From Swiss-Prot:
<keyword id="KW-0963">Cytoplasm</keyword>
<dbReference type="InterPro" id="IPR002778">
    <property type="entry name" value="Signal_recog_particle_SRP19"/>
</dbReference>
<protein>
    <recommendedName>
        <fullName>Signal recognition particle 19 kDa protein</fullName>
    </recommendedName>
</protein>
<keyword id="KW-0694">RNA-binding</keyword>
<dbReference type="GO" id="GO:0008312">
    <property type="term" value="F:7S RNA binding"/>
</dbReference>
<comment type="subunit">
    <text>Part of the signal recognition particle protein translocation system, which is composed of SRP and FtsY. Archaeal SRP consists of a 7S RNA molecule of 300 nucleotides and two protein subunits: SRP54 and SRP19.</text>
</comment>
<keyword id="KW-0733">Signal recognition particle</keyword>
<comment type="function">
    <text>Involved in targeting and insertion of nascent membrane proteins into the cytoplasmic membrane. Binds directly to 7S RNA and mediates binding of the 54 kDa subunit of the SRP.</text>
</comment>
<dbReference type="GO" id="GO:0048500">
    <property type="term" value="C:signal recognition particle"/>
</dbReference>
<keyword id="KW-0687">Ribonucleoprotein</keyword>
<dbReference type="Pfam" id="PF01922">
    <property type="entry name" value="SRP19"/>
</dbReference>
<dbReference type="InterPro" id="IPR022938">
    <property type="entry name" value="SRP19_arc-type"/>
</dbReference>
<dbReference type="InterPro" id="IPR036521">
    <property type="entry name" value="SRP19-like_sf"/>
</dbReference>
<dbReference type="GO" id="GO:0006617">
    <property type="term" value="P:SRP-dependent cotranslational protein targeting to membrane, signal sequence recognition"/>
</dbReference>
<comment type="similarity">
    <text>Belongs to the SRP19 family.</text>
</comment>
Length: 89
C-alpha cells in the first residue's frame, strides 16, 4: 500500500493546471468538497483520513483541508482522481 494526498484543488474545474488541477477539464467538478471526495473514496473501498485544518500550498491563506488515501501501489493518483470525479458535481 502507498499513501497519497488528495487536495480538492486537484479536481476543481475553476482551477487551471498551473493553479493545481491534476485532471483534464472534462473530468473536473465545480467546487469539490472534502465530504464529497470522502464519500466517493468510501464507495471505492479505499482507506482514508481527513485533515481539515490544512491549506493548499498554492493558496496558503485558504484553509481547505486534504485527504490522505491508502491505495494499491499499482494504482496511480490520476486513476483515483478520475474515479472520484465520476458522477460528481
Amino acid at each position: 500500500m502507498k499513501e497519497m494526498i488528495i487536495w480538492p484543488a486537484y479536481i476543481d474545474l475553476k482551477r487551471t493546471k498551473n493553479e493545481g488541477r491534476k485532471v483534464p477539464k472534462e473530468f473536473a467538478v465545480q467546487n469539490p468538497k472534502l465530504k464529497d471526495i470522502a464519500g466517493k473514496l468510501k464507495k471505492m473501498g479505499l482507506e482514508y483520513s481527513i485533515e481539515h485544518k490544512k491549506s493548499y500550498p498554492k493558496d496558503p491563506w485558504e484553509i481547505c483541508g486534504y485527504i490522505k488515501v491508502k491505495a494499491d501501489k499499482r494504482t496511480s493518483k490520476l486513476q483515483i482522481l478520475k474515479e472520484i470525479c465520476k458522477n460528481m458535481g
